[in-house]
A protein has these predicted regions:
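Short beta-strand element of the alpha/beta-hydrolase
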Residues: 34-43
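Active-site glycine-rich loops that stabilize anionic/oxyanionic intermediates
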Residues: 42-46, 121-122, 255-256
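Catalytic active-site module of serine/aspartate enzymes centered on a nucleophile-bearing elbow/loop
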Residues: 276-314
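Alpha/beta-hydrolase fold nucleophile elbow
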Residues: 109-121
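Conserved alpha/beta-hydrolase
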Residues: 50, 55-81
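Alpha/beta-hydrolase-fold enzymes
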Residues: 127-214
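Short beta-strand/loop motif that positions the catalytic acidic residue
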Residues: 251-253
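Alpha/beta-hydrolase active-site loop
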Residues: 87-107
Length: 314
């Protein structure tokens, strides 16, 4: 059995005197026998509730798992107008700080067990930034659905930084549509399910995403500025230089995931780490799976691989 509790955790804001708060859910085994913790960072235009089944499974295996909604997402957003908008001043640093604050909460609550980090998609880039900032908090990291350098990302960051000062809350349907269209290029011969084909092979998962009012909300200019900022920092050639070379990392992705350039991005990331002397890097591409490998038809295989990797590193 799993005990599940939800609440809000307050953070100090980057803007002096301003506080932020995150909606989180903690999953833990009812018997109290906890062998490790896991902090999960979700992706863009979704929310932590989509990881409930995965978190419950891990809690049944003896982990204390915490999921939470980033700024501008899920129940952390104060209202629907806040969805897709983070904050005007240094939003990328704020989301990384929020993640560290959640990690600190989990670490203090379960101080005598190993702590692990998992980030998916945008959450994978936030996770990589968090490892730069506070890698010593963790005993290992699972990077899901990540990518390498994106051509034009630095230019996009510069342009969006300027637009963030002019019209941060503006939601460009063109930019949002372009983003989805690029991700769907490989699948253009399939019947288009409102631009969600790239997310997964599982059509039920696509429909669940489309029917979830907290998913797929148009990102604001500020949202894309935040996304590009964490992406550029996370994909720097020496992004992991603050981590010890023995730090264990598991990189997993679908072979048909456009965010990882269909395996090329994750392979390059792992190759760079190995060239830099990292000794405990594991990579697995799941044949035929797309972006959301935690929500695919064969997701149980992914779940099993993750728990086996964690148990190997206890």
């Amino acid at each position: 059995m799993v005990i599940q509790t939800s609440d809000y955790l307050q953070h100090n804001g980057i803007v002096k005197g301003k506080l932020t708060k995150s909606y989180y859910t903690l999953f833990r085994p009812e018997n109290g026998n906890i062998k490790a913790t896991l902090l999960i960072l979700h992706g863009m235009q979704e929310h932590s509730g989509r990881y409930m089944e995965f978190a419950q499974y891990l809690a049944e295996q003896g982990l204390a798992v915490i999921t939470y909604d980033h700024l501008g997402h899920g129940r952390t957003a104060k209202n629907t107008e806040e969805l897709g908008f983070f904050q005007i001043s240094n939003p990328a640093q704020q989301v990384v700080n929020d993640a560290e604050n959640i990690a600190d909460y989990l670490e203090k609550r379960y101080s005598d067990v190993p702590h692990f980090l998992l980030g998916h998609s945008m959450g994978s880039f936030i996770a990589r930034c968090l490892l730069q900032q506070a890698g010593s908090r963790f005993n290992g990291a699972i990077i899901v659905g990540t990518g390498g350098k994106v051509p034009g990302a630095k230019l996009g960051k510069a342009v969006s930084a300027l637009l963030n000062k002019i019209a941060p809350r503006h939601r460009s349907r063109f930019i949002n549509t372009f983003f989805n269209k690029q991700n769907n290029l490989r699948f253009k011969n399939e019947p288009n399910e409102s631009g969600t084909n790239w997310l997964s092979v599982d059509k039920n998962n696509r429909q669940a995403f489309l029917q979830d009012e907290l998913c797929g909300v148009l990102f604001s200019i500020n949202g894309f500025y935040t996304l590009l900022s964490v992406n550029v920092k996370a994909t720097d050639r020496r992004w992991a230089k603050t981590l010890p070379q023995a730090f264990p990392m598991l990189f997993i992705s679908g072979s048909d995931d456009p965010i990882g350039n269909f395996g090329k991005g994750i392979k390059q990331t792992v190759s760079d780490l190995e060239q830099d002397g990292f000794k405990d890097i594991t990579m697995k591409l799941y044949t035929g799976m797309r972006h959301e490998i935690l929500n695919e038809t064969d997701k149980q295989n992914v779940y099993n691989d993750i728990i086996n990797w964690i148990e190997k590193h206890l």
